[in-house]
Amino acid sequence: MKIAVDAMGGDNAPQAIVEGVMLAKQDFPDIEFQLYGKEAEIKKYITDEKNITIIHTDEKIASDDEPVKAIRRKKTASMVLAAQAVKNGEADAIFSAGNTGALLAAGLFIVGRIKNVERPGLMSTLPVMGEPDKGFDMLDLGANADNKPEHLVQYAVLGSFYAEKVRNVQNPRVGLLNNGTEETKGSELTKKAFELLAADETINFVGNVEARELLNGVADVVVTDGFTGNAVLKSIEGTAMNMMSLLKTAILSEGVKGKMGALLLKNALHGMKDEMDYSKHGGAVLFGLKAPVIKTHGATGPDAVRYTIRQIHTMLETQVVPQLVEYYEGKAE
């Protein structure tokens, strides 16, 4: 299997990206990595050249570039070349920590969506508290700001497919994010989506779920519109960061006693931090495209890159995308 890597994407590129690839090489000797970017800079961090190909380019897409314009005008940008490699069959998947909007555009306009998938969704696997090996898939997280009820139903299908094939969740429970659990709650969008989801016998729909319940594992797949999903994701990220910051401040404010207490609780505190770190589940997938297109956080480090490559390996190994293509071809007949 071959993975096209945008080595210049992200705040810490290319160092964090290449170091993460070096870690992943130890886990997956069957992967061939294509690193797109400035060859001289990339080579600084390569410790083993086996299964590594560098495709040199001086051009990259910046974090503040307008996504669609950047994809169209910067034809030799590292991200664009990586996406083209997937389109041309020279690579099986693309990974980037760069401009999210540009990667979404590259995924849609270059890699292409699966026939009969109207709106591919941006999806992440988020943690379930108290169960570190478990998680839930949530989409859409920002690929589509405006959605129709039918899109949310399609997200339920996409999320269920991923949960079952990639995360090995049998008959995944699907929840609709809403401002209350009652059937009558919500906007016109969620009310209509509720009706459609409840009527679809192929979806294991468990009803409305509230944001406060998400991390308790109330559902295996949570669907929502892209605007709401993105806001909820950032709220979860912000809450996690602030909790750790508050805890640190409280400990330091107690002086020596606080530091001694923290030392005694060191393992528990590390466990708490790890449990809230959803990067262990990999990156965000733009699911519904003809190949895996994966995005990680711009400030990602080597470990997060390693986890994301593990995720891509699983997606390719389980052939989840070809199975999804077959599923939608069958629905069209």
UniProtKB/Swiss-Prot annotation:
Similarity comment: family membership: Belongs to the PlsX family.
Signal peptide positions on this chain: none
Subcellular location: Cytoplasm
Organism, as annotated: Enterococcus faecalis (strain ATCC 700802 / V583)
GO annotation (BP), single: fatty acid biosynthetic process
Purpose of the protein: Catalyzes the reversible formation of acyl-phosphate (acyl-PO(4)) from acyl-[acyl-carrier-protein] (acyl-ACP). This enzyme utilizes acyl-ACP as fatty acyl donor, but not acyl-CoA.
GO molecular function: phosphate:acyl-[acyl carrier protein] acyltransferase activity
Pathway terms, separated by semicolons: Lipid metabolism; phospholipid metabolism
Protein name: Phosphate acyltransferase
